[in-house]
Every structure is written in C-alpha cells, then in structure tokens.
Amino acid sequence: MRKSLFWALVCLFALSQVGLASSSKHIVHYQIKAKLLPDEKAVAGEEILTWLNDSDRFISELQFHLYLNAFKNNRSTFMKESKGVHRRFKLDKKNWGYIDVKKIQIKDGPDLTTTLEYIHPDDGNKDDQTVMRVSLPEPVPPQEKITLHIEFYSKLPKVFARSGFYKDFFMVGQWFPKIGVLWNGEWNCHQYHLNTEFFADYGVYEVEIAVPGEYVVGATGKRVKEVRNEDGTITYTHYQEDVHDFAWTACPDFMEFREKFTLENPPVDTEIIMLVHRSHLNQKERYLSSLKNGIEFYSQNYGPYPYPTITLVDPAPGAPGAGGMEYPTLFTSMTFWWLPKGLFMQEMVTIHEFGHNYWYGMVGSNEFEEAWLDEGINTYSEIKAMAKYYGEDSSMLNTHGLKISDFVLQRARVMGIGKMDPILKNSWEFYSIGSYGTNTYSKAGLMLLTLERYLGEKVMSKIMRTYFEQWKFKHPTSKDFIIVAEEVSGQDLSWFLTSFCTALINWIMLLAKSDPRK
C-alpha cells in the first residue's frame, strides 16, 4: 500500500471518530515505531512526540515517566517498597527490566540528551530512575507545541508486576518514555511505587509494531495497516484517538477471535477482539459472555462505549502477574483451565477490567493521588454488574447450594483491615498494600453503595451518569465528584463523602430486627 493511500485511510478513520475527538483536547501526539526482540526480551523503539503546553505559563523543562526502570535493580522505589513481590507474584532476579533513553532531541533542533537527569519528587531516593527531566534551550510558550525525537531500548523483566515476558509471551505496558501531566502549571509526574498505577494526558497514538511472523499481536486501538516484511517479520500499525496510553501484547500461542457487538439503546458498535491462550480455549465462551455483559452494563448505566475496538488478553499460564490489568481499549483478564462454572472469578475480573475503560480510561483520574476515583467507583460498578448478571446473592459463587455475592466479599474485606487508612490519600502513603487495596477498592465501593441507599437508586444513577459525561476525557478530583453529587441530589453531601474519604471511621454493626407490631 502506498504511503499516501495509507495516510488517507488513517484520515478517514480519524473522521469516523469525530464524536470522540470533539470531547477531548489532544495534549499529546505519539508516533512510535517499535520492534520486538524476542531473544533479548526487549523492544527497540523510536518515538516522535508532539506536546502541547496547555497552560498560561512558559515551560522550560519537560518531565517523563520511565516506568520500566522500577525493575532495574533492588534500589528503585518500587523494589524497596515491594521487596520484589507484587500481588503475591515474585521478581526473578535473573531477569531485570529497564528503559534506556539513547537519544532525545527537539525535532530538527538541539540535542537534549546531555540535559537528561533523574529526579525523585516523592521520596528523594537518588537510586530511583522512574522520572526523568530534560531542560529546554528555550521555554515553550503557553498554548504552543514542541516536537521531540526520542530513541529508546526497553528491556522487559520476567513478568510479575503487569509488564514483562514469560517464555514467548510478552505483555508490553508502560514501555516507552511517557511525558508527565502539566497540571495547573506544575508538573505532576510521580515516581513508580508499589501501590501506584498511572496518570497521563489524552491525545493520539500511531504505533508501528514489528514482530516475528509467527506472533499474534493485540494492541490499543484499531489496526489500520499490516505489512509482511522481507525478513519474515510483520509490522502492525495501530491508531487511536482520545486515549492516554498505549499497550500491546504478542505471543505465538494466542488464538484470535473477533466478533462485532452492537446495542441499539444506547447505540454501541464495536469489535470484540479476544486473544485466548490455546491452553484456555475451554474458557473462551465465558470470556465472551462476560465481556458482552460488561459492555452492555457500563454503556446502559454510564454512557455508550465509544471506541471501535475492545481487546481482551488472556495471559499465558505461568504469567499470572500480567493478568487483571487495564489499558485503553485493551485489558488483561485471567482464568484457569480447571475453573468451575459456579465460581465467577473469571467473569468478575473481565467485567472489572473492562470497566476501567470508563473510570480510568475515559475519566482520567489521577491514580497516584486519588486512586479511589477509579478503583472505588469501578468496584461499585462491578458489584452492581455482577449482581445483575450472576445473581444478587450468588454473584461470586453459586455451586452445590453455596452462594456468595461480590458485595459480601467486599464487606468482609473491609471488616478485616479497612480501618487503617482513609480512602483519600496518596497511593504510596498507605500503611500497606493491603490497606491500599481495601480502602481504595472495597471501602470506596461500599461507600458509594451506601450513598445509593441513602439517596435512592434513581438519584445515584443520575449522579454517576452525569459525572461520567462531565468528566469524560478530563482529569477530575474528589472535589469534582462531590460537586456533581451535590448538584444532582440537591443536598449537602460534604458530611458523608468527606467523612468517608478523609477520616478514619469504625462502623459498629448491630443486629437489627424488625418489629412485628409496626
């Protein structure tokens, strides 16, 4: 395909997303060429980044996340906090990961590589290299753009914490130099911590991925081009607007399944892409059914899913650390070949991770500082979705007469260690990873269910839909959520939300009995 024809097709694709583009201000535009090096367990990359200074200040330096450097050695902040363990999965000390920025320069301008330095805004750990800063020869004026050319090499760790490899399976997330968020004229670019996830600005991603011919590839966005190269590799090009990240996966043992999914009310038209490892083919229909349920529930309750694709990735056996993670238009789920039908763990993970495309993907919450705005709201949504499709009292387990709901499990979790921290706190400052998870997921989700029972389901439904519509493709704070809740309900809710979010409260549950005389 000639280059001019290819970009004409890309333009047509972009026009087809005009409904999306009208909602998002494109702060970043990434053009990335990536080559998978299976023997080296690495990715060689070249990046053209155009960044908009969407502030009223002159900006004289740029800050970037280098997330993979969390796995560079045992002195990084992530490794010090985790001791090499994440969600019970352990680091292989023979297979570290890192990102090497070989060159960074202004396109057709000065080389900035010599100005590169690592900074440590959160904890002062001089051995941490997950945030870099470069100085500019001239500041970027307000509402002006700068374009950079970056060359990098990303060595992937053996996967135990989201990104990495296991044999010939690759989950490639947080893999390129990613510019931080300029928020209120200041850089918001935190280090990578054990408890933190990610935060970035919206824009456009055009990414070319070259892999050996036997590999099956899935990635953020829609595939717009596929070229078979003379050396036996295949280059896949993906394009997506109105996203704040780009992730991809590759494995020769993936079986790819595609199916169109549509809804009339609200109107949804997307393509489901499932990459199922051949050892889990017996679980394919469970993946498909639960993903359809997720798309339907979130679309009907919050707003129609707007992207042309959604990709479900089933990680290889031996790579559970890659499972249960969200990226824009792509997520990883998890299962086991022996998973019984009455245990809905696979369904819960699939619906939960898809749901992040709303509360992390389209509503761009700052997961470093206010993780509950994603994790808690999504847990609330997950509980309601699971109850709808799998039973109010059996949404997690329904077998041999034993029934357990998602709600009951979340409540039990809070009764364990939920009292250690308030919900609203910098993610790396929680007492422990257990307290972080319990408070930002379970306690926050139950807080919203309690609010629903206080206000009524109809009012709460309007709050959630209004919040999603007002803050889609933007960066809200907890204050913004409270404002929406108060405007929709017509009530002062500061007493309720601030007590849950910022205070430590132990709720004592007393046995309540109905009075037959009333």
Show which residues each predicted segment covers.
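Short, hydrophobic/aromatic-enriched beta-strand segments in well-ordered soluble domains
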Residues: 47-49, 64-68, 136, 144-158, ...
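Hydrophobic helix-coil surface modules that form long, contiguous segments used
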Residues: 179-187, 194-351, 380, 392
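A surface-exposed beta-strand-loop module
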Residues: 52, 87-168
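Glycine/proline-rich low-complexity spacer/linker segments in large multi-domain proteins
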Residues: 76-87, 92, 153-205, 260-262
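Amphipathic alpha-helical substructures
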Residues: 280, 437-518
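Acidic/His/Gly-enriched intrinsically disordered linker/tail segments
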Residues: 375, 379-446, 450, 454
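N-terminal, polar/Ser/Thr-rich
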Residues: 13, 19-44, 56, 166, ...
